[in-house]
Structure formats: structure tokens, C-alpha cells
Amino acid sequence: LAYLSKARELQSKYATMPHGMTVLVGCETENIESPHSIDALTALLHGDAVQDTPVPPPFVGRGTVDYIVGSVHHVHGIPIDFDEPTFLKALQVHGTKDGYTSLLHAYLDAQYEMLERLRPEIIGHFDLYRLFDPSAPWYPECTTPHGREVLNKLKRNIHFASSYGALFETNSSAFRKGWKEETYPGRVILQLILRAHGRLALSDDSHGVHQVGLNYTRVRDYLLREGVNELWYLVPGGTLPCADKGGNLSEVHAASEEARQARELSDTPGRDAPT
């Protein structure tokens, strides 16, 4: 909560400067252990209100933060991006045979749960699971049963996020971590996003001032090679849409959910998604 207080203070400060700068205050998610991790985040963002009246997914965090970055960094409670030995431990949990595919299934299921429950505005480093072994056989041939199952889950998550207008983070940090020709999302995921008419946002995932904007030129070159010609960004939004009108959030959610579900089932779920 100290973070929110300081962030809001700086948000106001920069907005009123002569050459004002728009600052958005957000938070990044985790799904270490289902369902407790997301339960804890929802409770933190809404306090006792969650116990009395559950907040529909599109409105989680409204009034507390300006946006949510939906990320997954753990599989079955084990970090996959901390260091290589820990990643290998996560991989070994799934056995030596088809270990990569099994880990990927677990990751995508954890990601999907997070998407369903939180509807984050930004999807963080979609294919973070590739960090320490980007050339591994993550994606079996689509002509095999394993390959079709993986592809279906990838498309499931991408179509769901695209259908409500999420932005997929194009994250330059993989370059500073040793990747050469691509970053998050890698080519396979990026092309699935583009086919779904998903939206991309630019991010450096900086953990300090020395990383701000790092490798953006390389990201630009990568995106141009892959046929990307536009990027999206967030702007300040409102609080709960009917908080001052006596409305019911569940009714507001239900009114838009049918259209979202129809988009999700289409080949291009992001085409007419809300902005």
C-alpha cells in the first residue's frame, strides 16, 4: 500500500508540471498457487468488498490501480525465470519425457485462469517459459495429438485475451538476457496474435533506470520483420463504471459478455474488441 500512495503522489506531481507527463499506476499479477494467489490479489485490490459482493473480472482493480499486467512466473509453485537451475527443477517435475510440453500445458492453464479471473489490460511476456531454453521443443508438430493440444491452448489464451481488448506486451528484456533474433512474444506466438488481430504494446520490463528503453531499436527491427505495423498504449480510464449511478456491476458485465464470447469464437477476436 505504500507503493500505491507514493505512486499516486508522483502521478499527481508529473501531471501538474509545465510539460506534464501522464503516469499510470499499475500492478503485476502472479499465479503461484491456484486459487490462492489470485484470491489474495483480488482481496488486496478490493478489501472487504470482495467478501460482500464479488467483483466481475473486467472490474478487478478499478479504483485502486489504473491497469493490471497479467503475468505468470511460476509453474506448480516453482519459479521459471529466476535462474537456470530453478527452471530445470521446474522442468524435472514434469519428467524427462515430454517435459517441455508438460510444463507448457501447466503454464498455459495457469495463465488462462489468471486471464479469466482478472482480465488484465496487459498480458505480460506471454512466452516467458522459453527464457532459459528458447530453442527447446516447446511446440510439437501440429500434425501430432500433442501438437494440436498445445496449439489449441495457445489459441485459447490468445483468443480470450484478444476478445476483451487486452494488449500483448512486446517485451525487450529477452534481448538483455541473451536472446538474439526475437524477444517476447517469440515468432510462433507473435504470429498467432497477429492472426487473431490481437494488439501489441511496447515494454522494456525495466528493473532500474539503466534499463529504461533498452533495446527498443532491436524490438522495432524484430516487429517490422514479422509484419507488425502498429502498437497500442494505455490511456487513463475511469473507475467502476456505475459506481456513482446506482448500477449493478454484474449487469454491466453480463451485457458485454455475450458479445465478447462471440468474438472469442471467431478467427479474429481482436478485430472489434473494445478499446
Regions found by a protein language model. Give the residues of each.
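A short helix-to-beta-strand connector/capping loop
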Residues: 18-23, 64, 119, 198, ...
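Divalent metal-binding pocket/active-site signature
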Residues: 63, 67-178
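Residue-level marker for buried hydrophobic side chains located in beta-strands
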Residues: 25, 122, 200-202
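A metal-dependent hydrolase metal-coordination microenvironment
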Residues: 1-86, 93-105, 211
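A general structural detector for well-ordered alpha-helical segments in enzyme core domains, enriched
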Residues: 3-10, 40-44, 55-56, 110, ...
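Charged catalytic cores and adjacent phosphate/nucleic-acid-binding surfaces used
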Residues: 130-131, 138-275
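Active-site metal-binding loops of divalent metal-dependent hydrolases
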Residues: 29, 72-73, 126, 204-206
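Secondary-structure boundary motif
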Residues: 9-17, 116, 163, 195, ...
